[in-house]
């Protein structure tokens, strides 16, 4: 799983309410959710993001309520994955469950607008000639993401046995 795209950089403590604000969150349709992603903190985001782009953040990305809509909106926009220093636990699970890869680590070396090539399985991020390393998901969680999420994983494998 290697992707190339532009970095969209956010700070610390980005809540699910900032990703998909509750007052706009009146649908479960991913295409509609995509239109409201970050609408209050970065109004240009949904219009300008391209498939393969990467969300990068500081600490506690996706904290707050258990809105699956936050992860669904990012996936519907074609976000390749999220790199952050830490994640809200519910967002972390929601992202994996719908097939969004995540990397953990210090993100100060990545700036808004950087063009990066990300290997989501090894944690290697290439920015020009520079290589940054992040912590990838553990193997079992990577398998779920590779399959496109937990439902596809179950459909294809028939169980949730950890090997």
Curated annotation (Swiss-Prot):
Signal sequence annotation: none
Keyword Aminoacyl-tRNA synthetase: no
EC number from the UniProt entry: 4.2.1.33
GO molecular function: 3-isopropylmalate dehydratase activity
Gene3D superfamilies attached to this UniProt entry: Aconitase, domain 4
Entry's Gene Ontology BP terms: L-leucine biosynthetic process
One Pfam family named in its UniProt record: Aconitase_C
Top-rank EC class of the record's enzyme: lyase
Matches recorded under SUPFAM superfamilies: LeuD/IlvD-like (SSF52016)
Catalytic activity: (2R,3S)-3-isopropylmalate = (2S)-2-isopropylmalate
Keywords: Amino-acid biosynthesis, Branched-chain amino acid biosynthesis, Leucine biosynthesis, Lyase
Pathway: Amino-acid biosynthesis; L-leucine biosynthesis; L-leucine from 3-methyl-2-oxobutanoate: step 2/4
Family: Belongs to the LeuD family. LeuD type 2 subfamily.
Described function: Catalyzes the isomerization between 2-isopropylmalate and 3-isopropylmalate, via the formation of 2-isopropylmaleate.
Annotated NCBIfam families: LEUD_arch
Quaternary assembly: Heterodimer of LeuC and LeuD.
Protein name: 3-isopropylmalate dehydratase small subunit
């Amino acid at each position: 799983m290697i992707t190339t795209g532009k970095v969209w950089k956010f700070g610390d403590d980005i809540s699910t309410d900032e990703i998909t604000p509750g007052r706009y969150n009146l649908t479960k349709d991913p295409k509609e959710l995509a239109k409201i992603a970050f609408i209050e903190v970065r109004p240009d985001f949904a219009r300008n993001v391209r498939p393969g782009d990467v969300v990068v953040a500081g600490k506690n990305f996706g904290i707050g309520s258990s809105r699956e809509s936050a992860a669904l909106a990012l996936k519907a926009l074609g976000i390749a994955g999220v790199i952050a220093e830490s994640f809200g636990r519910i967002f972390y699970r929601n992202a994996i469950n719908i097939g969004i890869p995540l990397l953990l680590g210090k993100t100060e070396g990545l700036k808004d607008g950087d063009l990066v090539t990300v290997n989501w399985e090894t944690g290697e991020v290439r920015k020009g000639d520079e290589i940054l390393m992040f912590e990838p998901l553990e193997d079992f969680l990577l398998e779920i993401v590779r399959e496109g999420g937990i439902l596809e994983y179950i459909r294809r494998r028939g169980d949730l046995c950890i090997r």
